[in-house]
Design a protein with these regions (language model features):
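Bacterial N-terminal signal peptides
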Residues: 7-15
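Cationic, glycine-rich low-complexity segments
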Residues: 37-162
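Membrane-engaging insertion elements
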Residues: 146-169, 234-276
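Extended amphipathic alpha-helical segments with heptad-repeat/coiled-coil character used for oligomerization
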Residues: 157-206, 210-223
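Acidic-basic catalytic patches of nuclease active cores, encompassing PD-(D/E)XK
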Residues: 262-349
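Conserved catalytic cores of phosphodiester-cleaving nucleases, focusing on short active-site segments
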Residues: 328-388, 394-396
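Domain-level recognition of nuclease-like catalytic cores that cleave nucleotide substrates
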Residues: 399-427
Length: 427
């Protein structure tokens, strides 16, 4: 992502209404008579790896607007049309298309069909409506039972009609816990997010999980690779082994408690902790990933400021992903050649100060251009670096690619630039 995305994510309006993405270097250069670059419309076939652009079950539409600060993709698939805000979301959605395909293949097997019959005749059939919620379309925000199970696991104790006994309520809780654990196991074994907001995927996961939990269906991840060229390219995720383990073993309520403890341990106040934990822009997965990333910044002061901004300004899944991926880039720098000392804030934007004094901006930014707001923000960074009378080194690190013009402008102002720190689906 780039600075305009940050304006949306962290509310840095005015300072960061900025930049976007430019065509690949092969595109015609900006008009030399213009002081700044225009926001372009990219071509998917030119910027994406071939296996991401097209596969047996999907094609990314050619037009890729950059108006919101992220590459805006539309995916036509055998299972419907999916939107993807940004490079990272594109990778996730394409991978989910192939997970849906594999799950549908499983649902056609005789073993699966027999398991459904067994489930229908078994003691858990009455609980089916408690743990499944039919879905007909992709939504950016989980709804109904899916949202309940995904974000408010602590409310599980309240399930049940008012005239039912406590023992009956506890029995229903046990049923839901067993089902959701099975569903998490299936999703994670396939390398996909069990709390994905892709409702088509959730419906397929529901079916397989129900047959497995209530009907005795034997599910093996070994039989469900995300196949083909696309699968080979997409099986690498940002999730660490510790995140995968936590998602597999812990229900949302436990993750919430762990995240609360971790946030308090790194200096986040009680108010900001609860505000962050209650922000539904963050799924259990993105919430936990963000906290783990911040926790990995051992010894870095003022991490609480990033949490404050994320909790206050994030309003959707793309915002949460931005925070997760940006904090992951911070972790890469901290464990690599730029150990960090503290996080400073320019309004709501976190800026890293390294132990050697280097001022570092590290962002998930798809493809960045030189715009008026980028110029304004550059000036803000230069002022920060000049504080104390001694100019500090300046470094900008982004996940995607910078335009040649942007690199030139930054370098001429004394910045060191580093792009493609996590190029994702880009060629």
């Amino acid at each position: 992502m780039h600075l305009k995305v940050l304006a949306l994510v962290l509310g840095v309006t005015g300072v960061l209404a900025c930049s976007a993405q430019t065509p690949e270097p092969s595109e015609p250069p900006a008009d030399p008579s213009s002081d700044f670059e225009e926001l372009p419309e990219l071509k998917a076939s030119e910027i994406l790896k071939p296996e991401v652009f097209q596969g047996p079950h999907h094609t990314v539409r050619e037009s890729v607007p950059t108006s919101s600060g992220m590459n805006q993709f539309v995916i036509d698939s055998d299972f419907g049309v999916f939107d993807a805000d940004g490079n990272e979301m594109l990778l996730r959605r394409v991978k989910e298309v192939y997970a849906i395909a594999q799950l549908k293949d499983v649902s056609r097997t005789d073993q699966f069909k027999q398991s459904l019959l067994t489930a229908a005749q078994g003691p858990y059939n009455a609980a089916k409506n408690l743990v499944k919620d039919p879905v007909t379309a992709v939504s950016n925000v989980p709804k109904g039972v899916m949202k309940f199970m995904g974000r408010a696991g602590q409310s599980i104790k309240n399930i049940g009609k008012k005239d039912e006994s406590q023992s009956e309520d506890e029995n229903k809780v046990e049923k839901i816990i067993g089902y959701t654990k099975t569903k998490r196991k299936i999703a994670i074994s396939m390398g996909i997010d069990p709390y994905s907001t892709n409702a088509v995927l959730q419906k397929q996961l529901d079916e397989i999980a129900w047959a497995s939990w209530a009907g005795g269906f034997t599910f093996s991840a070994a039989t469900l690779p995300i196949g083909g060229a696309a699968g080979a390219a997409l099986t690498v995720t940002q999730a660490s082994d510790s995140l995968d383990k936590m998602l597999h073993e812990k229900p949302p309520a436990d993750l919430r408690a762990i995240n609360r403890s971790s946030l308090r341990s790194i200096g986040v106040g009680a108010t900001d902790t609860e505000r962050f934990l209650n922000n539904t822009a963050f799924s259990p997965t993105s919430q936990t990933a963000f906290v783990l990333n911040l926790k990995s910044l051992e010894g870095v002061a003022n991490r609480a400021a990033f949490v404050h901004a994320a909790a206050k300004e994030s309003s959707n899944e793309s915002d949460a992903l931005f925070c997760v991926q940006t904090s992951a880039l911070m972790g890469q720098l901290h464990s690599g050649d730029h150990p960090l000392a503290r996080i400073a804030m320019i309004e709501n934007l976190p800026v890293c100060i390294a132990k050697d004094g280097t001022v570092i901006v590290t962002l998930q930014w798809d493809y960045a251009a030189w715009t008026p707001a980028a110029a304004d923000f550059t000036g803000q960074l230069q002022k920060l670096a000049a504080q104390g009378g001694e100019g500090k080194p300046l470094l900008i690190v982004i996940s995607g690619q910078m335009s040649p013009r942007l690199q030139q402008e930054l370098q001429s102002r004394g910045f060191t630039v580093r792009d493609r720190a996590n190029s994702g689906p880009l060629r």
